[in-house]
């Protein structure tokens, strides 16, 4: 993965965060994307201290414009994108009959 540019959505926690650390340790240039910019910046700082090249972009994957801005910022910083890991996701626990349509729409939009 050395010098590959990888975008990871959902990078502020869980699997996305773990992927960011692993890929950075393998030499990838990592673009962190998530709604929680504070956590992204914390991860970015930690990875930079370890010698990684990192860019954090606040991104709501349910918004088309935010996704376009993510791609544009990645290209502006690194000049290319080699891989996109669509890791952002949310879940819900409810019976379908009890579910509000807006909640279902949000789950579908993110996932």
Protein language model annotation of sequence segments:
Residues 5-8, 84-85:
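Conserved hydrophobic beta-strands of the Rossmann-like cofactor-binding core
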Residues 12-13:
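Conserved glycine-rich cofactor-binding loop
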Residues 26-43:
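Conserved glycine-rich Rossmann-like NAD(P)H-binding loop of the short-chain dehydrogenase/reductase
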Residues 40, 67-74:
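A conserved hydrophobic alpha-helix of the Rossmann-fold in NAD(P)-dependent oxidoreductases
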Residues 52-53, 73-86, 92:
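A glycine-rich helix->loop->beta "capping" turn
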Residues 59-69, 101:
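The beta1-alpha1 cofactor-binding region of Rossmann-like NAD(H)/NADP(H)-dependent oxidoreductases
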Residues 95-96, 100-105:
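Substrate-binding pocket helix/loop in short-chain dehydrogenase/reductase
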Residues 108-111:
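Short alpha-helix in the Rossmann-fold core of NAD(P)-dependent oxidoreductases
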């Amino acid at each position: 993965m050395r010098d590959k540019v990888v975008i990871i959505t959902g990078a502020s926690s869980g699997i996305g965060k773990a992927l960011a650390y692993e890929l950075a340790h393998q030499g990838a240039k990592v673009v962190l994307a998530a709604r929680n910019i504070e956590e992204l910046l914390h991860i970015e700082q930690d990875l930079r201290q370890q010698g990684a090249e990192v860019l954090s972009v606040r991104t709501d994957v349910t918004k088309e414009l935010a996704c376009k801005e993510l791609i544009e910022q990645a290209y502006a910083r690194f000049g290319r994108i080699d891989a996109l890991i669509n890791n952002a996701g949310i879940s819900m626990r409810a019976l379908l009959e009890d579910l509000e349509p807006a909640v279902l729409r949000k789950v579908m939009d993110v996932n």
